[in-house]
Amino acid sequence: MLGKFFECEANRNEKYYRVIQTIKEYSDGRRFPLNEIVVADNKVDLNATDRTKMGGFCISSYEYIFRWLIRGDTLCEVKIPEDTKIYKTVSDNGIYIADKIILTNPKKIDDDFAMELYRKSTLPEISYFKAMTACSICGYTNTAMKVCTDKVNKENVDIAITELEDFCKRRNDEKYINDPLAIESVKILYDRLKEIKEL
């Protein structure tokens, strides 16, 4: 029986994706190899009572991967090994979890590719605000501003500003935002949000 965070077992043969970091190592020194089986440190726990304890690797579908660009600089296709089950979680953001994955077909993310992912995305409104901020932090300024133009208005700008501030605070706490270009890109977005608020 599946726990409260899991909706169903998913089809292993569907197309899945994961954003990975290749320019620098993760904080734990890990690097993800390509075209070989990678095993999660913690197995999927179907009875987890806390989302952070679900285990496995989080992966997503193409229409939701825009939400996860903050995770790295490269988009990979994900194959699920024959002996591994994959589970769809109870989430509005298309999150799937598996114990083992194979990362293939890496593609570097830049502003143009981020824009493509945005145009093919189907996210809840609040997730667009998070993704917009993530794009700004990653230096995908054109994409961030396009999301802002398309998704932010006088009625929801306060929510967008709160999401940006909360997102950036978490990143600052994690010592993530230390790049002058990222700081400038976030400022451009923040100033635009304040302009919308003053309309």
Language-model-detected regions and their locations in the chain:
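ADP-ribose/NAD+-binding catalytic cleft of ART/PARP-like enzymes
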Residues: 1-54, 67-73, 80, 84, ...
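Contiguous, structured surface segment used for ligand recognition
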Residues: 56-58
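Long, contiguous interaction/recruitment modules in multidomain scaffold/adaptor proteins
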Residues: 63-111
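Active-site-proximal loop/hinge segments that shape catalytic or ion-binding/gating pockets
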Residues: 91-154
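Charged, low-complexity interaction regions
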Residues: 123, 143, 171-180
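Conserved positions within tetratricopeptide repeat
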Residues: 145-146, 161, 187
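Short amphipathic alpha-helical heptad-repeat segments
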Residues: 153-164
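Extended amphipathic alpha-helical coiled-coil/heptad-repeat regions
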Residues: 164, 177-197
